[in-house]
Structures are given as C-alpha cells and as structure tokens.
Amino acid sequence: MKKILIIGAGAMGAAFSIPLIDNNHKVFITEPYSQRFIKNLSSKNKFHSGLKINLSKKLIFKKYGKELFLEKYDLIVIALSLSGINFVSRELKKYKVKSPVLVLTKGLKYDKKNKKITTISQTLLKNIPKLNVSVLKGPCLAKELVRKSQTSVI
C-alpha cells in the first residue's frame, strides 16, 4: 500500500482517487484554494458536486498547509489548474519535498520573460531541478475515470 497525496480536489483530482483506492493505496486529498470545498467533501456522504458522486469513504481529506508537506508520501499528484502550477512549485520547493510528482494538469505555459512556451514539467523542473516529475496525458476525462470507462493515457 502506497501513501499518495492528491493536491487539487476538483473533478480530475477526485476522479483520480478512485483507481488509486481501488488498487488499495492510502489516498489523501487536499484543496489549496477552497477550504470550504474540502470541508464539504469531507462531510459524511463525501458528495462531489462536479462529478455528481459520493467519493470513497476510504479517501482521507487533509487541510492544506505546512503540516501537509511535513509528511512523507510515496507519490504526490498535482491536479490543479494551470495557474496553480507556479504556486504548488514554490510550496514543494519551500518544504523541500522529495517525493516523486505526477502531474495531471493539461496545457502549456507561456514564459513572457523569455518569450518561450514551456511544458508543465519544465516549469516545475525550473524551480526544483532535481524533482522526479512525470506527466499523465489523455484523452481521459474525469467523468470517464469515475465511470471506469476504458480510456487511453500516455
């Protein structure tokens, strides 16, 4: 059983927790932008309004903060919007996180200063050069993951 932290409790982060729990991993989920959202998700029925499902009772909700990064995880999954990548990158660097990172975020970033398009993994590695980072790409929608539909990812 691996200990996995998902940062981002939106549709894809929450949906990604399902196969992880199905494979008997200990899964934690947090939301840096909305404590109210994570509080609602951690209620008795664990209803996710975006996915229209009750999440697993085995899913463990954590308040976002410094204490979160003091724990050791076998994997950290980033499921934030593109705008959250720089924020979480600074947090991972600040707390000297050594866990491998899996990015679910779609998109490319435009570096205005260098007038260059970069991938999300390049953005993370720019801030944390020795970070062990992988990226999961679709086509795979959160609702397909919830329904356990066959999809393809690379």
Task: Identify what each model region corresponds to.
Residues 152-154:
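Core active-site phosphate/anionic-ligand binding loop and the adjoining beta-turn-alpha structural block
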Residues 1-54, 59-64, 70, 111:
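NAD(P)+-binding Rossmann beta1-loop-alpha1 motif at the extreme N-terminus of oxidoreductases
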Residues 65-66, 70-150:
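Rossmann-like NAD(P)(H) cofactor-binding subdomain of soluble oxidoreductases
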